[in-house]
């Protein structure tokens, strides 16, 4: 195999590779011989088809298989000999394909991973925020539980519905005068002044009496989950059937038993544990973000542009989707596209650099992702698709890249845990509200 370097600029590398025909001919002949053993042609006994006929009929398909195999093998050997760690899948351009008596020639372009010097992190100082679960938080959650178990009693008085009342209605939603899917329902209890499933829906029923009919106009939010209705103005034909009042049950052991618990104390314990879990997740997001901010200041190496481009394209696809349905936050919505792209390219570069630095720290510290951890991640992914778990596992078994997509976040979190353990961490108690205001890490 002959290798000629054609580019060596920054992280970019390019080579021209020539594989002599003599190296390929033996493999090609062996492959055709294997084919000859299995094919059946009229007039010939199995395994006795002339080599010239086998070559005539199957030569092109064998050449195509051998071409891919030879290019992959030669590229792998090239990277090993040149000690290249490619940042992304290399670009291959075949100059001269496999033909009788001709060498295989192809070009390889790739970016290499940068040489990363892990900075000294021994003096790293971090603050770990935490919050305690208050009785007020537990009581509020219990009130929510009671509201979900409330009953509705009919109001016999003939009067208009007022705020706080519940109106039992039938409705038919129409888009451009035609009923739309999912827009029709009967015997729905609507709390007047409460949160309707569309802004303005419940409010316009105030003042209706049992037996009254009304047409109301509402506009679906731009980010409504049904794309065919997002941002659309529709009407609802409302028929009020009865006026009711909501009666919340007493918050006691009886309520606990009706929803499957032993007593009220058990519910309080579960609510407390769930809140503690949420606070711990928020606390980790904050300390992780602070850690990444500190690491980001020490990433003085060049990021492969191909990796930055790939990361940016993923981010920008989400941004465009959010913009399409009106989910962009106020700050981003006020920026022009050029500024917005520059901001998110900076984020993409930060993510790539931090990812490479964390991976290098993990490599040097020999931090590994175990088979059990990968299996756990696959099981967690499979639980998202009830009834299709086997299909999910088959997908992972056939797609190594998808498995690597699970491995990356696990390794990242293990490296983050290692670095937090290494740092000088100060614990600080804050309120749950202060903890909830903390934005997540960018990586």
UniProtKB/Swiss-Prot annotation:
The cellular location(s) given in this protein's UniProt record come to: Cytoplasm
Give the residue spans that cross the bilayer: none
Q: Write down the chemical reaction(s) this protein catalyses.
A: [protein]-peptidylproline (omega=180) = [protein]-peptidylproline (omega=0)
- Signal peptide coordinates: none
Q: Name one GO biological process term.
A: cell division
Q: Which UniProt keywords apply?
A: Cell cycle, Cell division, Chaperone, Cytoplasm, Isomerase, Rotamase
Does the keyword Transcription regulation feature in the UniProt annotation? no
Q: What is its EC number?
A: 5.2.1.8
Q: Which family does it belong to?
A: Belongs to the FKBP-type PPIase family. Tig subfamily.
What this chain does, per the entry, is described as: Involved in protein export. Acts as a chaperone by maintaining the newly synthesized protein in an open conformation. Functions as a peptidyl-prolyl cis-trans isomerase.
**Protein known as:** Trigger factor
Q: Which organism is it from?
A: Gluconobacter oxydans (strain 621H) (Gluconobacter suboxydans)
